[in-house]
Amino acid sequence: MKKKVLAIALVTVFTGMGVAQAADVTAQAVATWSATAKKDTTSKLVVTPLGSLAFQYAEGIKGFNSQKGLFDVAIEGDSTATAFKLTSRLITNTLTQLDTSGSTLNVGVDYNGAAVEKTGDTVMIDTANGVLGGNLSPLANGYNASNRTTAQDGFTFSIISGTTNGTTAVTDYSTLPEGIWSGDVSVQFDATWTS
């Protein structure tokens, strides 16, 4: 009888030890990329974003990170042109939360320290006034060539404002509801060849 009690006691001890051990904890996240493919080598002006934007909330700063969004610009030269101008203008910049809250975030766009706004054009190149475009300067040098010219540059994107429900503005991003916001940031580019 003592042997049976001892055996049962040992089984109970070993079973109890399993419960006391730490359990594994696993977490999973999914990253999703939007994907399309397009080729255009004949239009007079082609602007191609070189990547996507992903803003992450950082608890330590109670805000979202900023992003450098690169783009490629290709133009067809015009041998009769005497001047060239390239401008940009913000078209859309609102991200909406993917739930029923209606929360929104507005994305600000900066080009070399100048805000790209919906209300006016931001001059990127203006050869007639000596604005040669920084990283886009190959365009300023090749606008009157007989072939295509390309250059790359980037905008700085950042979250500049938000709402909790589509109307109530927040000054402290930590008060935003949890979740994911989605939408498009669109910038219009206009090129003018002057003859």
Curated annotation (Swiss-Prot):
GO cellular component terms listed in the entry, alphabetical order: pilus
UniProt subcellular location: Fimbrium
Pfam families associated with the record: MatB (PF16449)
Annotated keywords: Fimbrium, Signal
Segment forming the signal sequence: 1-22
Induction (record text): Negatively regulated by H-NS. Positively regulated by IHF and EcpR.
Predominant location category: other
Similarity annotation: Belongs to the EcpA/MatB fimbrillin family.
Described purpose of this protein according to its UniProt entry: Part of the ecpRABCDE operon, which encodes the E.coli common pilus (ECP). ECP is found in both commensal and pathogenic strains and plays a dual role in early-stage biofilm development and host cell recognition. Major subunit of the fimbria.
Protein name per UniProt: Common pilus major fimbrillin subunit EcpA
Organism: Escherichia coli (strain K12)
Species classification: Bacteria, Pseudomonadati, Pseudomonadota, Gammaproteobacteria, Enterobacterales
